[in-house]
Structure formats: C-alpha cells, structure tokens
Amino acid sequence: MKAQPKASHFIDGEYVEDSDGTVIESLYPATGEVIARLHAATPAIVEKAIAAAKSAQPEWAAMSPMARGRILKRAADIMRERNRELSELETLDTGKPIQETIVADPTSGADAFEFFGGVAPAGLNGSHIPLGQDFAYTKRVPLGVCVGIGAWNYPQQIACWKGAPALIAGNAMVFKPSENTPLGALKIAEILHEAGLPKGLFNVIQGDRDTGPLLVNHPDVAKVSLTGSVPTGRRVAAAAAGSLKHVTMELGGKSPLIVFDDADLDSAVGGAMLGNFYSTGQVCSNGTRVFVQKGIKTEFLKRLKARTEAMLIGDPMDEATQIGPMVSWAQREKVVAYIEKGKAEGATLVAGGGIPNNVSGEGYYVQPTVFADVTDEMTIAREEIFGPVMSVLDFDDEDEVITRANASEFGLSGGVFTADLTRAHRVVDRLEAGTLWINAYNLAPVEIPFGGSKQSGFGRENSLAALEHYSELKTVYVGMGPVQAPY
C-alpha cells in the first residue's frame, strides 16, 4: 500500500501497533484505493499515550520557553525542507489538489511551529502589580496533558495548530486525527521528535467516535481542543463538563459573504469562489451564503458562472487540477443530497449540480455548484453542507442584509466586499461572527486569532490568544511587612 505507516500510533517517541483495535482503512479519495490500513486505539493504547504524556510533561514544563521554542523552530525547518513529501501525503490523505496542499497545508503547520517557537517568552509573560508596600505578580503555567481532536479537512495543519501552542506553553499532547485522514499527524510526530522533542510530549493515536470519549473522560486530561462538527462539539463539551476540563472548540459554520454594489466585482467573485470551492468546499469558515446587492446580481452571476465552469476537475496529483474529490464516499453522498434538496426547493441552478464525467467513476467527485434565487428558509441556506455548493441570495440595503446574515445559529466567520471602508467597518461591527474579512476571504495566517461564536464554538486558534487557552494564570501576593492580625 502506497502510504502505509510503520504502525498505527506514535507514543512515547516511537511507533506502536496494537492489532486488537478496529481496522481503519485509509482510502485515496480520487480512486477509492486502500492506501493504508491502521487500527483504532484500544483502551490500553489510550492509557499508554496519556501515561507517556503525563510522565514527560513536568520536565518539559521546567525547561525555559526559549529552549522549548528552539525545538519547535527546528521542526518548522524540517517541515519546509520536506514540503513536497508532506504535501503529497496530504493529497493522498484528503484528496485535495496538490496545487493547494503544497502552498497551504504543511506550510501553515510549519508557520505555527515557527510562530509559537519565536514568541514564547513574550506570550507567556506575567505582570507585576504594585500594591503600596506590598506587591503581586502573575505568571502563566501549563495545564498538563492536553488532548487534540482533529478534523479531516486540514489534518496536518490542525495537528500543528493545536500542538504548537500546547507544547510551547509547557504541556504534553495526545492527538487523535480523524479516522478519514489518519496519516499526516503521524508524520508531524516523527518530525517533532527528529527536531529534538523529548519522548512522550506529542503522541498520536488513531480512533473513531468510540475513542474520543476515552480521551475526553480521562481523569489525567486537563484540556480538550476539538475541531469538528457542532453535534460532536456538544458531546465533547458535555463530557468534559463532568470533570471541569478546559475546552476550546472550532466547529461548523454557515457564514455570510456580503457583496455591495460598489465592490470590485472580479475580486468579489474571486472571494466567493475561494470561500466556497477551495479544498472542494470542505472548509469550516466558508462563506456559503453569498449575499449580492440586487443591482449587480446579474453581472455577478454571469462572471461567477463563467469562472466556475472553467475550473479544472481531475486527478489531485496533477498540478493543473483545481477541484479534487470529496474526502469520502459518505461525504459525497451527503453533498449530492443537498444539491438535490436545493433543486427540489426551487433554487435556480447556475452551474454544476452533479457528478463530473471526466474523472474516475470510483472517485468521490462533485461538480462545484452555484445556486441563485436562494431564500433564507431553504435548507441549503440554513445547514452546513461542507462541500462545493454556493448559495447566492440577493438584498436591497445594509440593514436588511445584516439582519438576515445574523439570522443563523452559527457564528464562525463572514466577509464584506465594498469600496466604502467606512461601511465595511460598520458592517463587520454588527455581524455576529468571530472571524471576519474585508475585501478578502478565508485568509488565516497564524499571527491572527481564528475562531467563532454562537454554535460555531469558543476559544481561539493561533496568535498569542491561543496561549491563554493552553495555560492558566497563577497570582502571587508578596507581603513586604509584618502581618497585622486583629486577634
């Protein structure tokens, strides 16, 4: 098999196999071929991983942030040196086109290691509080053993986005990738240990929906960070609440992308396409509700249709390919069902709407699809599809579109295209979302916080803000004089 790892799990600095676990077959989404066969973690494997993390963490926490940072920066360098190899593995794992993975996946993970490796002393600083003769100070201390649970759309990136802040803050991590994309995180663990990370600090175990509760409910776990769906988030939050664990969650979205009539139309069309079709639409922050002001709707749709129909669908390993397959057959069937629902509920099909005929019949392909004349009540305008399906809605004025944009249980992200920057700032101030773009979309460099509100989660990935979620504040009061007691 072309991508078979040495073993299913990476624990305490080495590969570990346990064939008693349920078999997980990794399939190449472009062909359905089995490229690796792994095993889900048994309870014994979960215990082994958490025990390794718990044992290694105190000594790691005692190191200086600068020393920890040097290791992360070495890992970043190794990832960049092996970008092609890692990108090809990511394409095999996810089906995303190599033209995307080579610029957006391992490189983003390397950026996270470099960023957190370089900012640790400043990001973990406390404060001094003068209190007259006395004073107090605060310091940030690690939480202990952290669990990361990844999604299948950006497996390598997510492993790094969670691992980097956890490690630099002095924690140990047990990371569980999605069973759909089990391969990339193992390579990240390899690279971290090659860079000098002590054993036991970054462990990877495979698993399915039965494995997560073993991690979340474990008494030695201090914090859980999840990237996933809203239903999964609710289950994890409920389980973690029983032992008052720290929790951060980056969940789903149904984000609005608003195009006003003074916007640069080609840029707005490009933003809408990036916000719906990148990674075959499998991006949580996608602006899948595209609100277009009525005066430009016809021209917007004309340009959008032409550019969408010109996209190249095909072999993800071909650098010319722009649209690859969905991650799995089940996800393809889900997306196709939503497309049929859009047709049945009366939306106007502008482009796509079916299965492309120029690709392997065994692959999990869906055409990039655009619907117009979508209303707020339609299923495709309310529910997260997680595929290349764009809904175009029209609007008259600013107040109307803000009200409609906010009428969603989700609040992950949103965007505004307009030449009027005063209006742009006014609109984003009123949008109920955690991450917003003006005249851009879906750009998420590690220097800025990323996360949502409402049902889209809480907490932030990346930036110095992430360190607050992997540490806690300790306050120390220092008395400088005699203690006066009233008795």
Swiss-Prot record:
It holds the Pfam family Aldedh. It comes from the Bacteria. Pathway: Amine and polyamine biosynthesis; betaine biosynthesis via choline pathway; betaine from betaine aldehyde: step 1/1. NAD(+) binds at residues 150-152, 176-179, 229-232, 252, 284, 384. GO terms for molecular function: betaine-aldehyde dehydrogenase (NAD+) activity; metal ion binding. The keyword Electron transport does not apply. Its EC number is 1.2.1.8. Its cofactor is K(+). The modification Cysteine sulfenic acid (-SOH) is found at residue 284. SUPFAM superfamilies: ALDH-like. Disulfide bonds: none annotated. Keywords: Metal-binding, NAD, NADP, Oxidation, Oxidoreductase, Potassium. K(+) 2 binds at residues 244, 454, 457. The active site is at 162 (charge relay system), 250 (proton acceptor), 284 (nucleophile), 461 (charge relay system). Dimer of dimers. Involved in the biosynthesis of the osmoprotectant glycine betaine. Catalyzes the irreversible oxidation of betaine aldehyde to the corresponding acid. NCBIfam families: BADH (TIGR01804), PRK13252.1 (NF009725). This is Betaine aldehyde dehydrogenase. It comes from Rhizobium etli (strain CIAT 652). The lineage of its organism: Bacteria, Pseudomonadati, Pseudomonadota, Alphaproteobacteria, Hyphomicrobiales. The gene is betB.
